[in-house]
């Protein structure tokens, strides 16, 4: 049976984002908390410092590996090596199930950090190589290839996905980061709730994470470039990369201005400065690629 998965931000008392991670429900009483390896000790400490009850918590990082199979053909490929029905009505986006691949037990969840149809497969470490080779062999006819973090970075930027440490951190709030949809203050209590509700009551923020796309397809962006709004420096890019699906360099960064919403952004004139030269850019609060998020849910 399916169990749900939630993207989650853990806040501090000021409402700042201390962690950005995924919580997967394995069964009625067991959960996986999944974070990036670079944040492991930080998030482990935060979790243990703030537990409200006394559950059993174990770091199983070294016991499991993860293979992420992403792309329009991911369902066809994986369906050939697992008995689990991967059809959309049987395996919805944002859910996970126990499954078997190459006769080994795995946990698979339908999620994507790159904005395409795909599954993340959590595998006991001793079976990683076997399952990797099974996927590679089966994937040849689908032109399966290995991709690195720069490719992932480009794809997640096109989808407007934030990266903790670059785009969101302890001094950034959910509202400033455009992540207030993840907060459910009416459902439960959480650290930073008072700060979040206070900020929410003030209306439109004066600082906001915005996505940018250069009009010129030639210049390259890397991050930290100044954002020019109506002739004045208004912020810096926190992340940037070439966006192959959208045909030019893209980035995101915080800008400071009054009454920030899509209307005020549309009325503003934006440029990004690269090595003292300024290039025109369009701005958006929505993802530059598949803004409705339909491709992941096919």
Give short role names for the model-derived ranges:
Residues 1-5:
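Short, small-residue-biased leader/transition segments that mark boundaries at the very start
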Residues 6, 11, 16-18:
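Acidic, proline/glycine-enriched N-terminal capping motif
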Residues 20-22:
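Short, surface-exposed charged micro-motifs
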Residues 25-298:
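Conserved, structured C-terminal
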């Amino acid at each position: 049976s399916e169990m749900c998965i939630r993207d989650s931000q853990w806040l501090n008392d000021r409402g700042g984002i201390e962690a950005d991670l995924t919580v997967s429900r394995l069964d009625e009483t067991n959960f996986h908390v999944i974070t990036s390896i670079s944040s492991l000790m930080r998030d482990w400490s935060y979790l243990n410092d703030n537990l409200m009850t006394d559950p059993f918590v174990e770091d199983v990082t070294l016991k499991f590996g993860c293979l992420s199979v992403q792309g329009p053909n991911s369902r066809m490929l994986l369906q050939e090596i697992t008995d689990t029905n991967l059809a959309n009505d049987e395996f919805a986006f944002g859910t996970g199930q126990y499954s078997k691949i190459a006769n080994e037990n795995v946990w698979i969840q339908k999620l994507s950090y790159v904005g395409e149809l795909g599954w993340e497969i959590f595998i006991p470490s001793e079976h990683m190589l076997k399952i990797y080779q099974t996927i590679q062999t089966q994937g040849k006819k689908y032109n399966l290839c290995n991709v690195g973090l720069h490719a992932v970075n480009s794809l997640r930027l096109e989808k407007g996905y934030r990266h903790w440490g670059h785009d969101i951190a302890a001094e950034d709030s959910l509202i400033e980061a455009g992540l207030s949809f993840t907060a459910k203050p009416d459902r439960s209590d959480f650290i930073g709730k008072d700060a979040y509700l206070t900020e929410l009551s003030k209306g439109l923020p004066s600082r906001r994470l915005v996505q940018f796309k250069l009009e010129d397809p030639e210049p390259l962006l890397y991050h930290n470039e100044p954002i020019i709004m109506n002739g004045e420096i208004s912020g810096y890019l926190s992340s940037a990369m070439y966006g192959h699906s959208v045909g030019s360099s893209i980035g995101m960064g915080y800008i400071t201005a009054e009454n920030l919403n899509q209307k005020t952004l549309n009325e503003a004139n934006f440029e990004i400065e690269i090595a003292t030269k300024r290039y025109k850019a369009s701005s958006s609060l929505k993802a530059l690629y598949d803004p409705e998020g339909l491709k992941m849910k096919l």
